[in-house]
Amino acid sequence: MSTTPTLSHLDESGQIRMVDVGHKTDTDRVAIARGSVRMNATAYGLLTQPGQGKGEVLNTARVAAVLAAKRCAELIPLCHSLPLAFVGIDFELDEAAHSVHIRATCRTQYKTGVEMEAMTACSVAALTIYDMCKAADKGIVIEQIRLQYKAGGKSGEWRND
């Protein structure tokens, strides 16, 4: 017998609520989010020019992403505060598409997952790249921010390849 999907942050009367995770057992959890920042050739050239933008822009975006993951519960109203064990941010430069591909990985051992932390980290990394490159391209596009993988807890492993 299958269960009908529900919105977990709404009660029976449709009012918002924080999900009660007090009864759950701490388990190892991991989530990976991905996204991309696409820009024009000029901005991409400045970003990737040796001794120019790449190091500073991407390092700033990495630090911003880690901070965002740590503060996720302050930004997303019904998100639980949780102890992050790890936040990792990786960038892949895509010259053909003038894009930076972002991968945010978060881990914890807790009662609830780290999907929101990974998604927030990825989003803020993308926004930071946008902020630092917008002078060279007002038309920068942040795209495809999504959960790619999660594991742990009752729902187990999930992939979005």
From Swiss-Prot:
GO molecular function list: cyclic pyranopterin monophosphate synthase activity
Superkingdom field: Bacteria
Pfam families: MoaC
CDD domains: MoaC_PE
Record's keyword terms, sorted: Lyase, Molybdenum cofactor biosynthesis
Assembly mode: Homohexamer; trimer of dimers.
Name by which UniProt lists this protein: Cyclic pyranopterin monophosphate synthase
Species of provenance: Bordetella pertussis (strain Tohama I / ATCC BAA-589 / NCTC 13251)
Lineage: Bacteria, Pseudomonadati, Pseudomonadota, Betaproteobacteria, Burkholderiales
Gene label: moaC
